[in-house]
């Protein structure tokens, strides 16, 4: 089956009435709400709370899903987990990884036919999120129907993931993007998915929240990046750390690196046949953006697939940020990443 098949087998009793002061989402269990009320919290965009959970900030519904995931997920030796912070190339990484892992079933060289799943399914359907799909709303999915190697995705920091992927054979691939372009992409995305009845988030407001680690969950972004970066240095056979800008500059070299890390290196025959280039072309931003499934379908609610594809460029910051904003974020990044060895190119 092209699209992963799973079923939901349990959902806890929900709290429908009499919400406490801190509850902003419906559908939270009594037990979970009690835990949530004990967490430190700060107001982020549109006055929505971000709760401090296991050392990072997250919205209530995300914490509910992460809690279910941590309690119930059982890894298998050949599992692959793709990790990103939001708006840093997640859709692209899913497409690339799925195509590499399934290339012997679905030939990317002959992908002009309608047989390849990427032509009819969004990458997020092919590689499901732990927190937004599988364990959303406290669900406990039956994953027995997933083909091997099972491939999942997450935005959670490594500290919240590590116990669930401690099996030495489980592979983790992390993709990050320079913080400037990540912010611009996130700002556009937030406004795209916001109801038309609600005013847009102004850039200056969003930028201030971003620099304070309050624009999106799973951060602050620098701690998210550093968690995976340090683990990749400590255990390079376990965690592969990739940069969006490097993939844009030399996709074929990075595809080979990714395939080798996953234990499925390209053969000389495949390279001569043009398999590497075919995967790069099939999964390119331009190709994915023009597919009907990515223009007209929806993930959930207001999350239309087309909002996942804006520009896919490097250094878009020059079109939006003032010199003082660039200076502020540059100083923040330099300070937070100092001594780590992690650096970014802006072009």
Curated annotation (Swiss-Prot):
Q: Which gene encodes it?
A: SOT14
Q: Which InterPro entries match?
A: P-loop_NTPase (IPR027417), Sulfotransferase_dom (IPR000863)
Which keywords accompany this UniProt record?
A: Cytoplasm, Transferase
Ribonucleoprotein found in the keyword field: no
Top-level taxon of the source organism:
Eukaryota
Q: Which PANTHER family does this UniProt record tie to the protein?
A: SULFOTRANSFERASE SULT (PTHR11783)
Lineage, broadest ranks? Eukaryota, Viridiplantae, Streptophyta, Embryophyta, Tracheophyta
Task: Spell out the family assignment given in the record's similarity comment.
Answer: Belongs to the sulfotransferase 1 family.
**Regions that span the bilayer:** none
Binding residues for 3'-phosphoadenylyl sulfate: 87-92, 177, 185, 244, 310-312
State the compartments where it is located. Cytoplasm
UniProt name for this protein: Cytosolic sulfotransferase 14
GO cellular component terms, A-Z = cytoplasm
């Amino acid at each position: 089956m092209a699209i992963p098949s799973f079923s939901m087998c349990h959902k806890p009793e929900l709290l429908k009435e009499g919400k406490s002061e801190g509850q902003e989402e419906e559908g939270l269990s009594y037990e979970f709400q009690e835990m949530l009320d004990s967490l430190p919290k700060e107001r982020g965009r549109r006055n929505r709370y971000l709760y401090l959970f296991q050392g990072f900030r997250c919205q209530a519904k995300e914490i509910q899903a992460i809690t279910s995931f941590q309690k119930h997920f059982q890894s298998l030796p050949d599992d692959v987990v793709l990790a990103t912070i939001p708006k840093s190339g997640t859709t692209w990484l899913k497409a690339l990884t799925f195509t590499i892992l399934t290339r012997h079933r679905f030939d990317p060289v002959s992908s002009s036919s309608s047989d390849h799943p990427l032509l009819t399914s969004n990458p997020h359907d092919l590689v499901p999120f732990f927190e937004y799909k599988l364990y959303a709303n406290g669900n406990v999915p039956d994953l027995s129907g997933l083909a091997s190697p099972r491939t999942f995705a997450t935005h959670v920091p490594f500290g919240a993931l590590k116990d669930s992927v401690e099996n030495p054979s489980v592979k983790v691939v992390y993709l990050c993007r320079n913080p400037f372009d990540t912010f611009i992409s996130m700002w556009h995305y937030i406004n795209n998915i916001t109801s038309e009845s609600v005013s847009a988030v102004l850039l200056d407001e969003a930028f201030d929240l971003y620099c304070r680690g309050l624009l999106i969950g799973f951060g602050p972004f620098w701690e998210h990046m550093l968690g995976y970066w340090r683990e990749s240095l400590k255990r390079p056979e376990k965690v592969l750390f990739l940069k969006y800008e490097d993939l844009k500059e030399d996709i074929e070299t990075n595809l080979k690196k990714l395939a080798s890390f996953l234990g499925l290196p390209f053969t000389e025959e495949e390279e001569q046949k043009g398999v590497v280039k075919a995967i790069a072309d099939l999964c390119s931003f331009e190709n994915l953006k023009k597919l009907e499934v990515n223009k007209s379908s929806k993930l959930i609610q207001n999350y239309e697939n087309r909002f996942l594809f804006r520009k896919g460029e490097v250094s878009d910051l020059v079109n939006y940020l003032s010199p003082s904003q660039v200076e502020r974020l540059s100083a923040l990044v330099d300070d937070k990443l100092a001594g780590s060895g992690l650096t970014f190119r802006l072009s």
